[in-house]
From Swiss-Prot:
Pfam family, one: H2O2_YaaD
GO biological-process terms attached to the record: response to hydroperoxide
Ranges in a coiled coil: none
Organism, as annotated: Rickettsia rickettsii (strain Iowa)
InterPro entries (UniProt xref): YaaA
Name of the protein in question: UPF0246 protein RrIowa_0836
Superkingdom of the organism of origin: Bacteria
Record-stated family: Belongs to the UPF0246 family.
GO cellular component terms attached to this protein's record: cytosol
Length: 248
């Protein structure tokens, strides 16, 4: 089984990461192509296309301009935000972290896909951002889908567990994915309707990654006992391709 999660806008390059063997992102050539486009933008253009403040545009302009000399950090330790904070990465054993290295991918607008220990530099680029004529979802779709197919071909249980947001999981082409896609949903009953509450769903996704790592889980079936923040598996609302957890 291979799980996917979204990258995060929030980064943490201040806190030191544990010493571990680092790896290199697989699509650096394509990353450099995107960087060339990003480096051509003015601060004002970055502010507009990314819908960010002038201050953030300045920070990212400086990052892109001197990208090669920026500090590097393992992706799983560099990203912050609700998903990553609830993985509690700093508490994972080396064994659990090594398991994630072969069973988790982080979807990124700049890097395409990242293994947890792939080194990244500080950046901001959401998958929905349009760069000139480049649609990032289309830009990455074939490369990412083919890469996932290659990884799953070597897995014992050939499932792709989708814990990413729709914005990022859209980079997977279902028509070219050779193996079973299993989507995970975290729902809450609000006024008689089942709804996804973003912040709670993000926390639950991170907690599920933590459970996968700590228990070496390689099958969606083994996740049905997952419970966090009051979520519980709903047989009624689930199917072979959809795992639905409802908050009581």
């Amino acid at each position: 089984m291979l799980a996917i999660i979204s990258s995060a806008k929030t980064l943490n390059f201040e806190k030191l990461a544990p010493k571990t063997e680092l790896t290199i992102p697989v699509f650096l050539t394509l990353t450099n192509k995107l960087l060339a486009t990003l480096q051509s933008y003015s601060e004002n253009q970055l502010s507009k296309i990314m819908n960010i403040s002038a201050k953030l545009a300045h920070i990212n302009k400086e990052r892109f301009k001197d990208f090669d000399n920026q500090e590097s950090k393992a992706a799983i330790f560099a990203y912050a935000g609700d998903v990553f904070n609830n993985i509690h990465i700093e508490k994972l054993t080396n064994h659990a972290l090594n398991f994630l290295q072969s069973h988790l991918l982080i979807i990124s607008g700049l890097y395409g896909v990242l293994k947890p220990l792939d080194t990244i530099k500080p950046y901001r680029l959401e998958m929905a951002t349009k760069l000139n004529e480049i649609n990032l979802t289309n830009f990455w779709q074939d490369e990412v889908t083919n890469y996932i197919n290659k990884i799953l071909a070597k897995q014992e249980n050939k499932y792709l567990l989708n814990l990413a947001s729709q914005e990022y999981s859209s980079v997977i082409n279902p028509n070219k994915l050779k193996y079973q896609l299993v989507n995970v949903h975290f729902k809450e009953n609000r006024n008689g309707k089942l709804s996804t509450i973003g912040i709670n769903a993000k926390k639950a996704r991170g907690a599920m990654v933590k459970v996968i790592a700590n228990n070496l889980i390689d099958s969606p079936e083994l996740l049905k006992n997952f419970s966090y923040l009051g979520y519980a598996f709903s047989t009624k609302h689930s199917s072979d391709n959809e795992l639905v957890f409802i908050k009581s």
